[in-house]
Amino acid sequence: MGRRREVLALAAGWVVTRGAGSAWATTGVGQVLSSTGLADVVRGNAVIALAAGDAVYAEDIVRTGPDSRLQIVCNDGLQIVVGAGTELALRSYLTSASDGRLEVLLGLLRGIARLIGGASPTPRTVEIDTRTAVASVRSTEWLIESTDKGTGVLAIQGEVTVLGLAGGRVVLEPGQGTDVAPGAAPRTPVTWGQARRLDAIARTTI
């Protein structure tokens, strides 16, 4: 997994650093604002139930049940809504030593998540990898879903850059989405139909 993270990060032009090197690795990168149903976190060798008010840390893997949703508010204002049946790895949450930019690295192992880039005291870059793609943004609202059929990404506000692990790159404008099948490049951006867009947003609303 470490080598895969390096390849993904370098493809997006990032410097790879470990969550353990940040003070937030011990104080938490944010907390659970609200939740419905059962959710837990894999932290080291432990599995811990999550509820509103609980802290989350770098290198946690957040998991939701089939009828559960979870909203996380990070220390810098970034909001993450985790949909049902999802596993989301909080790989690292660090400030770059070179330019002071906050670099957030996440991994969507399966399921769906929506990210809302709230006001941040420092510039922020967010990157999420899946089994078929890596998506990155500066400050925007967007969602991403990972299934056995591949990855779907929708830009709600702002631009989202999507790289296929098999090659190819697209930039999504607001309202546009793309799909990345296993072993394929990202499809040409298109405006998602109302039914698909509203369904994805509804599944990431709590």
Language-model region placement:
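N-terminal secretory signal peptides
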Residues: 1-2, 10-18
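Flexible, surface-exposed loop/linker segments and immediately adjacent secondary-structure boundaries
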Residues: 7, 14, 23-61, 65-69, ...
